[in-house]
């Protein structure tokens, strides 16, 4: 019985830890090839301005693909070759928000996009 209670307590603690950090993406939608979209990621539960942030994506039936990254102060960025020149990552530390401006969209950009701490 003690083991069971310990296990339940551990699960409860881990659940609380997981709930502390929240990253909520928005801005997706349907767009024609060549169109544009801006994704947003609202962050809470941690000091956003202290962390580099990243975008990754997963196309239907495919694995995760790294898309872009930005340093904590926004001064340094990285782009995968597949999106370079078309996507722009940015952040607003005063709003705890990460952005991904996507232009000249292609069929192969179809994916679920995730922001990552």
Swiss-Prot record:
Residues 1-19 form the signal peptide. Residues 70-77 are annotated as: Complementarity-determining-2. Residues 78-115 are annotated as: Framework-3. Disulfide bonds join 41-115. Keywords: Adaptive immunity, Cell membrane, Disulfide bond, Immunity, Immunoglobulin, Immunoglobulin domain, Membrane, Secreted, Signal. SUPFAM superfamilies: Immunoglobulin (SSF48726). Pfam families: V-set. GO terms for cellular component: extracellular region; immunoglobulin complex; plasma membrane. Residues 53-69 are annotated as: Framework-2. One of its GO terms (biological process) is immunoglobulin mediated immune response. It comes from the Eukaryota. Gene3D superfamilies: Immunoglobulins. Residues 116-117 are annotated as: Complementarity-determining-3. Residues 20-117 form the Ig-like domain. It is found in: Secreted; Cell membrane. Residues 45-52 are annotated as: Complementarity-determining-1. The keyword Aminoacyl-tRNA synthetase does not apply. Residues 20-44 are annotated as: Framework-1. CDD domains: IgV_H. One of its GO terms (molecular function) is antigen binding. V region of the variable domain of immunoglobulin heavy chains that participates in the antigen recognition. Immunoglobulins, also known as antibodies, are membrane-bound or secreted glycoproteins produced by B lymphocytes. In the recognition phase of humoral immunity, the membrane-bound immunoglobulins serve as receptors which, upon binding of a specific antigen, trigger the clonal expansion and differentiation of B lymphocytes into immunoglobulins-secreting plasma cells. Immunoglobulins are composed of two identical heavy chains and two identical light chains; disulfide-linked. This is Immunoglobulin heavy variable 3-64D.
